[in-house]
Amino acid sequence: MSYHEEERHGGNGLDWFEESMSSLLAADVDLAGGGGDAGGGGYAWWWAASPAAQQDDIGSVVAQTLSPPSTAAPAAASPSIASPAASSPSDVPSSSSKKRKSPAHRAPGHTGGKKGGGGKGGGGGSDRDMRWAEQLLNPCAVAVEAGNLSRVQHLFYVLGELESFSGDANHRLAAHGLRALARWLPAAVGPAAAAAVRVPPCSERPTTAFAAAEPRLFRASLIRFHEVSPWFALPNALANAAIAQASTCGAAGATPRPLHVVDLGVSHGVQWPTLLESLTRQPGGRAPPSVRLTVVGPGATATSPVAPFSASPPGYDFSPHLLRYAKSINLDLRISRAATLDDAVPGDDGEALVVCLQFRLGHAAAEERREVLRKARGLNPELVVLSELDSGVGVVGGDGGSAAGEFAARLELLWRFLESTSAAFKGKDVEERRLLEAEAGAILAAADVAAAGEGREGWRERMAAAGFEEAPFGAEAVESARSLLRKYDSGWEMSAPSPAAAAVALRWKGQPVSFCSLWRPAA
């Protein structure tokens, strides 16, 4: 796909991305029926089967795989999956033509989730009995942690037959989960033992790494994701509303002050055009006299690898675009970059300082979280915006939990991402979706650093310990967020703030995804 860039001026907050979007929409072709060879070969029975029959077949494979071995006679092997007991690694299919095809190849009419149809659709279904990938991956994680290599090998064979980065949410989860378990295996059992386990090769072309993508594709993917999914868009909208209010102390008719935003997040500039535009529409038409944006790099925490979605590719720089846009709406904008929060130097006393901590701190180790919050408190900000995943698990090693249990929690969260992106992209296998899903899959990395998140209650305790007190969202901000959510798939919902919980939570089909909360320095 080719992305051509040209400078744009004026218009709304996303005009500076217009070229990316036009290229993206031109390339948005439904590939659901374009993959695979229709010849069928030895697997025509699989392609020709109805979706219900396909699901039943996979269900029987899962049941057979997870059932205890019979003492009387060995169970019959699946028509497609070789029995590890009777097969050597060389017998395992290594070509996509020897694997079960994904639904994108089998069912040209399938479009995944769609607006108004998120209740049971969206790429694989929400019911536990339909989520076969987790039924295979979680026992495999337990086997890896226990060092049960024969069990690991057996499940690797089965997962290798069913995985597909272009299939429905189950097939894609199997693909991401299998690769994550294969990377974890040497650390769990030792390199020598891990070398004896054969990892089925992936026959599909590898997806470009998020931080190594072509800059125009990277930018267009972020924009498209905000257009079709509220995963980041809703927390960003809530943050922007709170920041705009902070610039005037929340008082109607108050004189706007210079605004300084410290961005320790994952928006890569996509969040800010909307904020800049809203600042020019303040009551009385009085925008802040100046706006300063300090972007804190992905190395602000020592976590390795860096938090998903936090790194950008070499050559990607949103600053020139954003500066041109600010100039077109007569806003004085300055952009600087900081390696850590230590370099985010506050400005004048009259400056409204807001620190945005969005989707990065939750991937850091417990001590790093405390240190970053301590530094944020030291800046004495007017407001802190905290947006994080709402998975409700704790740091591994800190609560006695097992690595396999942590893997299961991360797998649950990744399922929600994959199922919701199926709905967002209407089942289409496009490069932008693959790029985003590959980065989201990084959450399955070996669970030896930090958890996927610790839930709202855990963060409330952590913020209070750092010297902050929770602040409520304005009614207008909440209503605007609710209105924004209506443009997305009906599987999305948000829980409004209450006296007991001031944060706004985002949910997919009733299950928690993330929350956005506001904090001020405690008196």
UniProtKB/Swiss-Prot annotation:
Protein family membership: Belongs to the GRAS family.
Region annotated Disordered, chain positions: 64-130
Function: Transcription factor involved in the control of strigolactone biosynthesis in roots through the activation of the beta-carotene isomerase D27, which participates in a pathway leading to biosynthesis of strigolactones.
Keyword Nucleus attached: yes
Location of region: Leucine repeat II (LRII): 317-343
Record-annotated disulphide pairs: none
UniProt feature, compositional bias: Basic residues: 97-108
GO BP: any one term: hormone biosynthetic process
Region (Leucine repeat I (LRI)): 131-203
Other known facts: Plants silencing NSP1 and NSP2 exhibit reduced expression of the strigolactone biosynthetic gene D27, reduced levels of strigolactones and increased shoot tillering. Rice NSP1 is a homolog of Lotus japonicus and Medicago truncatula NSP1 genes, which are transcriptional regulators essential for Nod-factor-induced gene expression. Although rice roots cannot form root nodule symbiosis, rice NSP1 is able to complement a NSP1-deficient mutant in Lotus japonicus. Rice NSP1 is able to complement a NSP1-deficient mutant in Medicago truncatula.
Region of interest called SAW, as start-end residue ranges on this chain: 445-520
A matching Pfam family: GRAS
Example of a GO MF term: DNA-binding transcription factor activity
Originating species: Oryza sativa subsp. japonica
GRAS domain span: 124-520
Keywords (A to Z) from UniProt: Nucleus, Transcription, Transcription regulation
Name assigned to this protein: Protein NODULATION SIGNALING PATHWAY 1
GO CC aspect terms: nucleus
Biased composition (Low complexity): 67-96
Compositional bias (Gly residues): 110-125
Record localization: Nucleus
Region of interest: PFYRE: 353-442
Tissue specificity: Expressed at low levels in roots.
Locus of motif VHIID: 259-263
Region VHIID, residue ranges: 222-295
